């Protein structure tokens, strides 16, 4: 499943290539990808057509595009995208006209633009970019574009959700004084329950620590709880726990303040490093908007390395092999020397 780095990579791609473009038409190929848009495909198509892609935002694994009305004002709802297990957002730029209509290059480019990807679910036909508000792209392409939602397993989807305020306490007073909540502090109603992620400028480690202290669940289960800390999935949870030398079943409430700080630092470092590498791609299901794979898989220390030497132990002259253990219908990877099991592993969330 795409986690924070993969979704952020897609968000950045949309921000660079698609903002400021009007939606000329919407084609719903498979209505199953609109299961969360309760008013149906016809309403989805009508509500998007004529609006302009204004801003690209993310919280955890959720991505949303704010919209402008024809007069440039901010629309009261946003287009929410969840990639699920295998979702992709792909950008296809319409070829220019400078090569001549009978040019072989022009025909090849047109054929690539018109090609429909396998597992295409929703297609947005976008017009040329133009200045429509504060959060617009610097890419002023004069040709059209297609924004394609492709999803092999159909666990992801798209839907429109009303925008609601979600102002951090540290800025709430200033926002109230201004009399109007700025766009950066508006989120889709469907996303508001999602906790802020470690790359959010208003992420609050102290609040996360308080949540840890209230639960006896294993720490990995808590890391995967998007209402506690968002954006972390199985891969990055295992990687962060390896760096922090913590067993996945250690009860969250037993972590010391130092262990909590080190774990959250490890989570943040892993996410930043993966983001810099374009995310983790184990197969063709995860790509950026241009169809390119990330390469953080080359840097993994625990996840997917069962039977291979622990890098840290090897550096210390020890031999310890990464083990794979069952965890909530999936797997956990750890070093049995660096990440020793707690005295009693029979805690909630350890399996």
Regions found by a protein language model. Name each.
Residues 1-351:
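Structured catalytic/nucleic-acid-binding cores of DNA maintenance enzymes
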